[in-house]
Structures are given as C-alpha cells and as structure tokens.
Swiss-Prot record:
The lineage of its organism: Bacteria, Bacillati, Bacillota, Clostridia, Eubacteriales. This is Probable GTP-binding protein EngB. It comes from the Bacteria. Necessary for normal cell division and for the maintenance of normal septation. GO terms for biological process: division septum assembly.
Length: 197
C-alpha cells in the first residue's frame, strides 16, 4: 500500500466530534515520547502532518487523519507521563475510554512500545484494556535504530514474555529515522483495510 494522501480532519475530546462517515479507523496508542507522531509522519511521508510535541503528556486530544480518502489514522493521547496531575490522568482516561468503548469503525489498534525498554505497567494495562474491548492489536516496537540486532532480538522476547500477545496479535518493528519496517507495516495495514472494505 502506498499512502498518497493524508489530511488532518479534526481534534476531538467528545464522541459527538468524531467523524460520522463510517470509514475504517486504525488507532495509534502508546506512552508519551514513544515516537507515535514520528511514526505516523514516516508512514504518510509527511514531516509535519502530526506535530511532534517536545512536552511529553501534552496532547489531550484524539486526532483524526484521513488517509488516501479511504480510511482514518487516529492518534490517541500518549499515556504514562509522571508529571501530570491525577485530574489530568483521569481526563485522559475518559477521553480514550470514550473512544475505545464500542467504536464500530475502529478495526485495529497499534500499540507502540519503545524497543529499548521493558513494557511498563501502563503498557501492560493498555494491552489488557484493548483485549477487554476485543480489539485486534498490532504491537509495534519503535526506535529500533537505537539498538543492535542482538539486543533487539532479546528485547522483543522480553516484550512477548511480558505482554503475552494473544493469537493473531502481531509484533512488528519500526524506525521512523531510517524507515526500517515501514514496508512490512504498510502491508499489514493494507490487509486490514482490504479485509474490512
């Protein structure tokens, strides 16, 4: 699949603001600073489609991007940033849960993990949450250019052993810097789009 067109549509905090055109949605979620914005920019070949925030935990909105005039990438707010208040954490939880709960258009969730670190409790909770809502999930280990191949192999095993992915949930690797893993990722996304189209 080639992404030829990518357009920001809306930032939403409430379900009433979500697009109503019934197009397929693929959501991206992960810890603050896991490289979510950079990954979406790399997939779409657009350097500034998604603003890369210098302040972790700043994004509190759900951003919808129309891809190839056919489906949406949905950028969910990052989680796990220690310096936000309990009230902010609660509001983050509500925004994300409102979206995940019964969103028919959502056909796949991409859970991003920094390949250099063991999944955190927040990552484990998020994966369990996605399974609770019965979403098929693609786990993507980001920043793979920052580790050696042997270290990556070890770290992927740690990710598998920690999250214990359900059958059908794939683990992919990705580098926004050198685009490693991009073709494979796009192929997987294409199969999702084809399946539901």
């Amino acid at each position: 699949m080639e992404i030829k067109q990518a357009e920001f549509i809306i930032s939403a905090v409430h379900p009433s603001q979500y697009p109503k055109d019934k197009r397929i949605e693929i959501a991206f979620v992960g810890r603050s600073n896991v490289g979510k914005s950079s990954l979406i920019n790399a997939l779409t070949n657009r350097k500034k489609l998604v603003k890369v925030s210098g302040t972790p935990g700043k994004t509190r909105l759900i951003n919808f991007f129309l891809i190839n005039n056919e489906f949406y990438f949905v950028d969910l707010p990052g989680y796990g940033y220690a310096k936000i208040s309990k009230t902010e954490k609660k509001s983050w939880g509500k925004v994300v849960e409102d979206y995940l709960r019964g969103r028919e258009e959502l056909k796949r969730v991409i859970l991003l993990l920094d390949c250099r670190h063991k999944p955190t409790n927040d990552d484990i909770t998020m994966y369990k949450w996605l399974k609770y809502y019965n979403y098929n999930t693609i786990i993507v280990a980001t920043k793979v250019d920052k580790v050696s191949k042997s270290q990556l192999f070890k770290n992927l095993k740690i990710i598998k052993d920690t999250l214990k992915p359900e059958t059908g949930d794939e683990i992919l690797t990705f580098s926004s810097l050198n685009k490693q893993g991009k073709e494979e990722f796009l192929k997987v996304l294409e199969s999702v789009i084809d399946f539901y189209s």
